[in-house]
Amino acid sequence: MNIVITGASSGIGFETARILAKDRSHSILAVSRNRLVLEKLKPGEEGGNIHIFPFDIVNGNYENELIPFLTGRFNRVDCLVNNAGKLVSKPFEKLEDHDFDDIFNTNVKAVYRMIRALLPYLAENAHIVNIGSMGGVQGSVKFPGLSLYSASKGAVAILTECLAQEFIDRKIKVNCLALGSAQTNMLSEAFPGFKSPLSAAEMAEFVAFFALNGHQWFNGKVLPVALTTP
């Protein structure tokens, strides 16, 4: 399978790319702004089928930068994992307009832009996996300081449901994994001192499995994946 993963330079995205690359039948396009960290995916036995592409998913030129790189290596895309995300932890009264823009541009607009850019290249029966959060699930426990982050992930969940219906005729499946806690830098930023029962690598094991197989059973679903929240 040809798989595109955003936010692949750290945390769950990095580990998901590493896990998927262990199967040499897969080719991975790992996307992130940070080339130096992306380079860590290359060394070793699993590195030969990983293509790294430093790219700003918010401000980058998809048509002139990402797509030429993609089509030079893949003739189609079988799976897209929209993993890149941004978190700001602030009391509501201290938020500024740029916080809103930063969060929604990364967590929502970039997901929209990536799907729109890759749509002509998505294979029949391709799978789009949007990485959401339990904070974006209606009725879930909410936490002070995470209003913008949770709202942005709620938007991703609704976008997932809408696109699953729009893409039925194309036979493209779209699902959202609403993740609970995993030990990442983002979790430490939101909940200093909290220790998750799951490592980033352990959460990535499920994300990788679901990316490859989840569309056999699900379409347009927002699926909680959480031992704790946090």
What is each stretch, according to the model?
Residues 9-10:
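Conserved glycine-rich cofactor-binding loop
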Residues 169, 176-177, 192-230:
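C-terminal helical subdomain
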Residues 24-40:
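Conserved glycine-rich Rossmann-like NAD(P)H-binding loop of the short-chain dehydrogenase/reductase
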Residues 91-92, 99-104:
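Substrate-binding pocket helix/loop in short-chain dehydrogenase/reductase
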Residues 115, 152:
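Active-site helix of classical SDR
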Residues 133:
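Residue(s) in the substrate-gating loop at a strand-loop-helix junction
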Residues 120, 161-166:
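Alpha-helical segment proximal to the catalytic Tyr-Lys
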